[in-house]
Structure formats: C-alpha cells, structure tokens
C-alpha cells in the first residue's frame, strides 16, 4: 500500500471495527489499532474482532485532546470529519500527519445540494428509522466542501495534499509524507 512489506494502520472513529477487521482479513501482515472515544464502541469492536479471529486491537482515545499512538504508517478516519468544527478538524488533521510515518487518509461526506437530496432520499428509502431520517441530512449539512477540506488540510500543514470526489457524495483526502 505504501511500499513497505509490513505496515501499521491506525483508523480513528470507526466504532464498530468493521474496517479494521476487513483490512486485517484481506491483508494478514498488517498491525491495526482502531481508536474511538466511546468505551462501549471499543468493547463491541474488540469482541467482533475476536469472534472473526482478526488480530486487531482497539483503544479508547479522544483524538482531539489526547496524543495519538505513534509508529503507524497509515493514519486514517472515515466519516468522522463532518462531526467536527473547523478548528477541531485542523487539530485532528495536524495530529494525524504528525503520527503517520507515510500517509494520512480521510474519507468523508461532501456538503452539496446533490448530497443533501441523496441523503433525504436514501434515508427514507432504506430505513424506517426516524433517527436516520434526521441524522443523514444533518450530517451532510455539517460536512465540509472539497475546497474547505483542502483549506483545512493546508492550515494543518499537509502540504501536497490532494482531495478528490468519490461516489456518491464523498471525498477522499490523501496526504503522503514527503
């Protein structure tokens, strides 16, 4: 993935642990440590990993106020950035860049009219949960635009960052250590 035979991967905010489990199962020579600020989420993720036979570790951590674990080649977060304000997003991105030996990856929603329409439609078509009906559009409204994410990354010191659109209404931030 980043030109090393064995690498260490630190996903943040993936409360159910599915991403770390899936990566471990598809790529056995990877050291994964997932973090989340909620102890119950970490407990569920660890239990899930153990049942799947995945050698994945999880830790309770508040990434905005605590030091991230060191020594990871790739540090990533998925569907987490839109929960933060601008200052928090810059703080998180800077901490991720400091921690990552090789790469930072951020996958998140993009704030757009199209995304808002899709969130409304998908929430109504795919679930009967009134919580999802409210939360999906709210998440899109609090997300950043592509240009805003680019600005946040540069403010965090991620020179050379690329931010690209992904289907359906997502973005991928990629930064490689020079």
Q: What is each model feature region?
A:
Residues 1-8:
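Conserved alpha-helix/loop element of class I SAM-dependent methyltransferases that forms part
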Residues 8-65:
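Class I SAM-dependent methyltransferase SAM/SAH-binding core
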Residues 76:
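A conserved beta-strand element that flanks and buttresses the S-adenosyl-L-methionine
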Residues 80:
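Hydrophobic adenine-recognition pocket in adenosine-nucleotide-binding enzymes
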Residues 84-96:
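A short, conserved alpha-helix within the catalytic core of class I
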Residues 100-109:
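Conserved beta-strand signature within the Rossmann-like core of class I S-adenosyl-L-methionine
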Residues 109-158, 162:
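C-terminal alpha-helical "lid/dimerization" subdomain adjacent to the S-adenosyl-L-methionine
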Residues 161-178:
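Core SAM-dependent methyltransferase catalytic element
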